[in-house]
Amino acid sequence: MSELLDHLRNKENEHLDHILLELYERELASGNMQGWYSLNEIFTGQYNSQDYYVDILSREGYMISSYRGNHIEVTITSYGKQFCETSSYSQPNVPIIKQM
């Protein structure tokens, strides 16, 4: 049972890292400070639990979200960028940007 829980936690951590990395890379590519990006595009064909992950990352201070109907726009915070450069959910103390 604990192996299953560990596996689920690892998957959750990978999803959280994925969201932050996508935001980080989009921010770098666009050169846009505090740009807003469609979370629906980030999640396309990948995950169904958008609200769950948005809640976690917003609560942790890594991103800010804005709901417009069933569309969610998100932006990475400076704290989120720093996290991408120094750590990750799936491998603490190993930067997300060096894992992908």
Q: Residue spans of the language-model regions?
A:
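A short, conserved structural fragment
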Residues: 58-68
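Short acidic, hydrophobic short linear motifs in intrinsically disordered regions
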Residues: 29-43
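Generic structural signal for hydrophobic core residues of well-folded globular domains
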Residues: 23, 27, 84-87
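Short amphipathic alpha-helical interaction segments
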Residues: 43-60
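Minor-groove-contacting beta-hairpin "wing" of winged helix-turn-helix DNA-binding domains
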Residues: 70-76
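Non-catalytic, well-ordered alpha-helical scaffold segments
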Residues: 13, 17, 51, 77-78
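Short, amphipathic alpha-helical interaction segments positioned at domain boundaries
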Residues: 78-100
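Short alpha-helical segments that sit at the start of domains
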Residues: 1-26
